Amino acid sequence: MNIFAAFEERIGEALASLTRAGQLPEGLDLGRVVVEPPRDPSHGDLATNAALVLAKEARTNPKALAERLAAELRSDPRVTEASVAGPGFLNLRLAPQVYGDVVRAALRAGEAFGRGAKQPGLVNVEYVSANPTGPMHVGHGRGAVFGDALANLLVAAGREVVREYYINDAGAQVDVLARSAFLRYREALGEEIGTIPEGLYPGDYLKPVGAMLAKTHGRSLLGKPEAEWLPLVREAAIGAMMERIREDLAALGIRHDVFFSERTLQEGGKEGGEGGAVARLIEALRARDLVYVGRLPPPKGQLPEDWEDRDQTLFRSTAFGDDIDRPLLKSDGSYTYFASDIAYHASKVERGATELIDVLGADHGGYVKRMQAAVRAVSDGRASLDVKLCQLVRLLRGGEPVKMSKRAGEFVTLREVIDEVGRDPVRFMMLYRKNDATLDFDLAKVVEQSKDNPVFYVQYAHARTASVFRQAREAFPGEDLSAEALAGADLSLLTDSGEAEIMRLIAQYPRVVESAGSAHEPHRLAFYLYELASAFHSFWNKGKDLPQLRFVNQTDRMSTLSRLALVAALRGVLASGLGILGVTAPDEMR
């Protein structure tokens, strides 16, 4: 039961009634009409912008239109007050039984409460896609958690989702990985390697790869030229790094449906030549006159060292909203990263995706326009791309920066953080700030048992709901406390302002799932859960001072059952929301 969607429909009916009465023209576009909680709860339960967005089209004054709508809605038995505020906002106050109906609906729907109806189209969410050249760091962890929670959120909102990881296994960086692993192979055979040469990957994480190569090949690789050992070592090193990455992701509860290898885009053909997926893609674009040979103007400001004033093979990305056309081939004839990226996103479209979401690091800001243009081109406008950039994570301990990891060589690994504080704090706190804002992750604060630690505060609320039911079973042995039985309780007894606040927030849950999913912003759900937990803890504390407001009262069975119905509905929402974020909902805090 989504009261916001229900009242959007009701406002549509009211507008239709005014149209039939000749007070409004026909064919008004209701696409921008929104029903949402008012910014100030004292103004009512619902607010709508209907009059503001429709007044011009209706050729009337926003305030006058709002007054007409208010008059129509006052006859609705669910509405106790309809008032106009400001330039034409319409605020509605609802009858208490509306919230009682929401609690009953939540109890009867169980896990389905707040979930959206199935929607058409396939969403491809690509996240993590860390280069297989070393351990994952906490920045990778933020993108991993964001992407996984977003995928969960979209599923909850009714979307079909494919979760994808792009393995960057075709670039120069994997050759550097192979040379770094070969150095560790020589070390494993007893050679003194000294300081790691500049340009190779430092850190101890490649030592096991070197040991594995030594065990498998003995000394047989030492006398071979690089051209012979490099492909073999590269394959082994990529495999070992991807195995480690998968283990780290599993420790964080992250899963993917597809691991897509960049190398497969070039299989069957030579770089810059015929046969591979990238080459076929370029030829298909050329056939549509979207590829040409030309010269790019020099970039503004200081010229990059690698900029060349020469004829280049260019993609007409400006035809699809980009700032400049983009090169597809390097001066040596090999593909640019952009060319491979176009082919990769074309593959997503070919596999049925109509909505593409890429979760990337903040350093990919320049990537957005060109890839959105590319997706429009390869899909003929049938697919869209949203790029979500995750800002940096500053790792702190008690407010002080954390030193680098010796094992990784230059950063603290994600696994080190998970092992220290646990999966739940990592996941929740990575989502408790909008993705495009820098995140301070304090290893000391995320394990504190206080209101200032959001993950503890929300999980503690769920644990408290479980303790309420343990008390209730002791106080009322034999009483049917199932959700179905509690849905029959007299919810008109829930008259305290604290109870009303909890019911108001429960009613918002379906809208939060829907809006957070459509905006691709899982932090909205994390914020909502903290607000809901706060309302519950506040009412719990109120009962300490006022015994008549306690959840379980042995001398008042009726009010106890009413409050248990409220607690059961709240517990279901907390568990559902935490589940979407990938965080456990404990019955006891340990």
From Swiss-Prot:
Family note: Belongs to the class-I aminoacyl-tRNA synthetase family.
Keyword Translocase listed: no
Species of provenance: Methylobacterium nodulans (strain LMG 21967 / CNCM I-2342 / ORS 2060)
Domain of life: Bacteria
Keyword Cytoplasm in annotation: yes
Motif 'HIGH' region in this chain: 130-140
Catalyzed reactions: tRNA(Arg) + L-arginine + ATP = L-arginyl-tRNA(Arg) + AMP + diphosphate
NCBIfam families assigned to the protein according to its UniProt record, in alphabetical order: argS
GO cellular component labels: cytoplasm
Name of the protein described by the UniProt record: Arginine--tRNA ligase
Pfam families to which the protein is assigned, alphabetical: Arg_tRNA_synt_N, DALR_1, tRNA-synt_1d
InterPro entries: aa-tRNA-synth_I_CS (IPR001412), Arg-tRNA-ligase (IPR001278), Arg-tRNA-synth_N (IPR005148), Arg-tRNA-synth_N_sf (IPR036695), ArgRS_core (IPR035684), DALR_anticod-bd (IPR008909), Rossmann-like_a/b/a_fold (IPR014729), tRNAsynth_Ia_anticodon-bd (IPR009080)
Gene Ontology MF: a single term: arginine-tRNA ligase activity
Subunit structure: Monomer.
EC number: 6.1.1.19
GO biological process, one term: arginyl-tRNA aminoacylation
Subcellular location per the Swiss-Prot or TrEMBL entry: Cytoplasm
Keywords assigned: Aminoacyl-tRNA synthetase, ATP-binding, Cytoplasm, Ligase, Nucleotide-binding, Protein biosynthesis
Top-level enzyme category: ligase
